[in-house]
């Protein structure tokens, strides 16, 4: 079923199979009349609003790589330190980490293996929230690790050491869900936690003792039932809160919630599977607490609310009102009533993928459903599409009454670890200036793949044309013209200082069967003579010792301002980068030599990184210091202990920008991560980040910062795209195996704080693969454009412009 048509289906008269909705409801009603406790009500009419590009929400990446966490698990948000602003706590395999979004600060609470369930609650009555969660400990007999429940108290400052207290040292399994509620009606809240992924799953309640540092009183609610999605609320109106867990609800014995007597199990949603998210709220305003439920680990999950009739019609205590389907791994669910508008809202968020090797969900959605008439009709507002989230929570960021949504990515396509990133979705009042970009095919029949793309005024008319592969495209008609005798153009520079740029290219290998085998390092430079007749003047530079140049830079690098070309080769492990020195007579061969014995062959930039007046070379993680006598001394800029950079060639594309405003040039980078093994053939999520200039590149390594993690990013560009005086970053994804099916994205990033710790991400396109593209250029006066191309989508040359 096409989920985008589901809103129409709910309001229509037939299902996708041609069965009248009334018949479906009648059939369901008949089945429950034979013993099931839930009746099937009318499908609520859902009106869908806010199509792609019109929604004024933006995504902020608060942390692309949470420290010490190899697999993100759960999260919670509240004012932990009493400053009136919201903190976020995220847990996972490796650590508990706290964040202060208002200042972009973060810190470590504890190291260890944590799961999904986490809650924030004032345990000791001091007015500040503590962290409650579960972690593993070694089994003393050498068996599998055991789970315990514990809570953490901060010092006077969140950066001070936190103290751990164990509340249950003998749990049955992983506490996937945690929530607090008043189960015994004494005005104090108790903990509810389930046990999952164990031999004997169950659900348990814990009462906080007078001294919460001691073990807590434990009550079994149920054992043997597998269920996820725990919430609490007074369902039967007795003044005590009951527990909902998946498709069941549980009521305490009359003797009391912690009397030791068994709790009673009731059926709530018999047609729903066990793995759910739930929320309790009075949907229709009749004074009774209803239940919202969504199936969370399925690609065909259903969302519904169940009308509470426990007291009115005890023989049929629940009426099911379907809301939406299919929802794809919707592992986030929240419900609330707006204090101002009195509208009731449900927020559902889909994951990137479910567990157990589920198919990837490239179009994951975050959706807000609202009703003004007690659940009779609903509006569906698409908050965000194309970004999966897990265990998302809603919170007032700074006490202003404006709520944001915090979440984290889960089940992303990583090579070895499930490192998710921390998200904040925030309303903006109006759509972003980046929301409406138009795409144009410059070429959709280019004969073969280009290895780079450039904007160069070829014909001298004052407009930047586009050069890609062995062709140039005239602006603005984009007619394709050949550059004769050339395999690829790799650079453009005004070599003879006549005010127009010449092109540097490589010759094609004669008789090659395809473009890749035709690549060489036979370098030439070209000058247009009569472009109306495709006449060019060609001069040899020389042949490099590598296979073909995958990165290069050109500038006055040598004593006296002499020009030189530096090339890094695709087979960098065998051929270090070389420098080609311009002769006095440019028509002669250029002298070549190895510039530095480093294993790098990707993008290079000539830039005075150390501020001494001489152009250095930035080569990925290396700084090649210009010594002023024609020699260049290599310095590694980052600590190789970072796993992402064990292969230093993993840094693929770079740009120079003063990110944090300290006046020093920093290095933006992307990391290519592709596995060409026939048994794998995947493009993995890899970092986009920046290296902070510490002031002395030759003496001190740069500080590493992550912006985001996207699919094998192999394209980067920078420019003031929105005209506000600040520089934005453009990044394109690169999936050479499944470019169409995997929906490669083109993103714009804008700093969300002045220091560049957090970044807002704006999707521009989700259709094309990018390789050495995403260049920010000015194709017409005062109008910024983005040009790009792909590796496998060889026929395409693209341009994006606003409007």
Where do the protein language model's features map onto the residues?
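Beta-propeller-forming repeat regions
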Residues: 4, 30-803
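N-terminal export signals
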Residues: 5-25
């Amino acid at each position: 079923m096409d989920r985008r048509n589901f809103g129409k289906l709910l309001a229509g008269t037939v299902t996708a199979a041609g069965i009248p909705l009334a018949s479906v409801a009648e059939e369901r009603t008949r089945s429950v009349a034979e013993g099931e406790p839930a009746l099937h009500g009318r499908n609520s009419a859902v009106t869908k609003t806010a199509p792609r590009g019109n929604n004024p929400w933006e995504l902020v990446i608060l942390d692309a790589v949470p420290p010490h966490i190899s697999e993100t698990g759960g999260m919670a948000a509240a004012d932990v330190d009493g400053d009136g602003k919201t903190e976020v706590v995220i847990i996972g395999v490796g650590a508990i980490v706290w964040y202060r979004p208002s200042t972009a600060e973060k810190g470590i609470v504890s190291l260890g293996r944590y799961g999904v369930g986490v809650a924030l609650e004032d345990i000791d009555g001091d007015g500040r929230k503590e962290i409650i969660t579960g972690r593993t400990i070694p089994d003393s007999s050498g068996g599998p690790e055991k789970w315990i429940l514990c809570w953490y108290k901060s010092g006077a400052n969140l950066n001070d050491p936190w103290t751990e207290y164990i509340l249950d040292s003998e749990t049955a399994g992983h506490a996937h869900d945690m929530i607090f509620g008043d189960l015994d009606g004494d005005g104090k809240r108790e903990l509810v936690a389930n046990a999952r992924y164990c031999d004997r799953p169950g659900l348990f309640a814990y009462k906080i003792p007078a001294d919460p540092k001691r073990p807590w009183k434990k009550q079994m609610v149920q054992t043997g039932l597998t269920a996820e999605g725990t919430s609490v609320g007074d369902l039967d109106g007795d003044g005590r809160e009951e527990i909902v867990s998946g498709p069941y609800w549980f009521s305490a014995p009359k003797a009391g919630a912690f009397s030791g007597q068994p709790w009673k199990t009731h059926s709530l949603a018999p047609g729903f599977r066990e793995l759910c998210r739930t929320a309790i709220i009075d949907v229709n305003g009749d004074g009774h607490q209803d239940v919202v439920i969504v199936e969370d680990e399925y690609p065909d999950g259903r969302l519904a609310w169940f009308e509470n009739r426990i007291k009115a019609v005890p023989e049929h205590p629940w009426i099911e009102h379907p809301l939406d389907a299919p929802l794809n791994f919707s592992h986030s669910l929240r419900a609330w009533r707006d204090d101002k508008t009195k509208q009731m809202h449900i927020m559902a968020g889909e994951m990137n993928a479910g567990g157990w090797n589920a198919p990837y969900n490239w179009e994951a959605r975050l959706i807000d459903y609202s009703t003004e008439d007690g659940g009779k009709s609903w509006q569906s507002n698409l908050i965000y599409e194309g970004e999966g989230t897990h265990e998302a929570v809603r919170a007032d960021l700074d006490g202003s009454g404006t709520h944001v949504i915090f979440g984290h990515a889960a089940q992303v396509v990583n090579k070895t670890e499930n490192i998710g990133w921390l998200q904040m979705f925030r309303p903006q009042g109006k759509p972003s200036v980046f929301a409406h970009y138009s795409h144009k095919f410059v070429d959709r029949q280019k004969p073969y793949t280009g290895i780079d793309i450039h904007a160069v005024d070829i014909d001298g008319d004052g407009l930047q044309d586009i050069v890609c592969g062995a062709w140039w495209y005239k602006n603005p008609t984009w007619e394709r013209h050949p550059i004769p005798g050339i395999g690829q153009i790799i650079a453009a520079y005004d070599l003879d200082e006549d005010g127009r740029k010449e092109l540097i290219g490589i010759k094609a290998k004669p008789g090659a069967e395809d473009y890749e085998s035709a690549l060489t390092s036979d370098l030439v430079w070209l000058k247009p003579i009569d472009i109306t007749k495709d006449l060019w003047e060609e001069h040899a530079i020389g042949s490099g010792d590598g296979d073909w140049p995958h990165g290069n830079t050109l500038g006055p690098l040598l004593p006296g301002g002499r020009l030189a070309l530096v090339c890094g080769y695709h087979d960098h492990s065998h051929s270090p980068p070389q420098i080609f020195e311009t002769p006095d007579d440019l028509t002669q061969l250029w002298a070549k030599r190895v510039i530095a014995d480093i294993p790098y062959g990707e993008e290079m930039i000539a830039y005075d990184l150390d501020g001494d007046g001489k152009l250095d070379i930035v080569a990925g993680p290396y700084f090649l210091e210009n010594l002023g006598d024609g020699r260049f001394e290599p310095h590694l800029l980052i600590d190789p202990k970072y796993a992402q950079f064990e292969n230093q060639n993993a840094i693929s594309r770079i740009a120079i920008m003063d990110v944090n405003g300290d006046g020093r040039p920093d290095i933006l980078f992307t990391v290519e991560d592709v596995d060409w093994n026939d048994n794998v053939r995947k493009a993995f999520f890899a970092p986009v980040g920046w290296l902070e200039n510490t002031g002395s590149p030759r003496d001190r390594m740069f500080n590493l910062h992550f912006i985001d993690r996207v699919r094998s990013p192999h394209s980067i560009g920078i420019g003031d795209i929105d005209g506000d005086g600040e520089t934005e970053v453009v990044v394109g994804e690169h999936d050479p195996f499944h470019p169409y099916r995997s929906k490669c994205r083109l993103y714009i990033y804008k700093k969300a704080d002045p220091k560049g710790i957090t970044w807002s991400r704006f999707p521009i396109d989700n259709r094309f693969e990018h390789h050495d593209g995403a260049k920010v250029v000015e194709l017409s006066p005062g109008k910024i454009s983005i040009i790009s191309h792909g590796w496998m989508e060889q026929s395409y040359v693209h341009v994006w412009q606003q409007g």
